[in-house]
Amino acid sequence: MSNTGTTGRIPLWLVGTVVGIAALTLLSVFFYGSYVGLGSSL
């Protein structure tokens, strides 16, 4: 397997997927907290 877009040893698509999932998780937690009322202090 030869990936053309590789940063060192980590493929770019893997980095993008992990970053995207982390961003969606943080956003969902923030919006859920603000909806419940816990995130209003943020």
UniProtKB/Swiss-Prot annotation:
The organism's lineage is: Eukaryota, Viridiplantae, Chlorophyta, Ulvophyceae, OUU clade
Q: Which SUPFAM superfamilies match?
A: Photosystem II reaction center protein J, PsbJ
One GO BP annotation here? photosynthesis
The UniProt entry's sequence similarity note says: Belongs to the PsbJ family.
Q: What is its main location?
A: plastid
> Quick one: a GO cellular component term?
chloroplast thylakoid membrane
Task: Give the transmembrane region(s).
Answer: 10-30
State what protein this is by name: Photosystem II reaction center protein J
Q: What is this protein's function per UniProt?
A: One of the components of the core complex of photosystem II (PSII). PSII is a light-driven water:plastoquinone oxidoreductase that uses light energy to abstract electrons from H(2)O, generating O(2) and a proton gradient subsequently used for ATP formation. It consists of a core antenna complex that captures photons, and an electron transfer chain that converts photonic excitation into a charge separation.
Superkingdom per UniProt: Eukaryota
Membrane-related topology note? Single-pass membrane protein
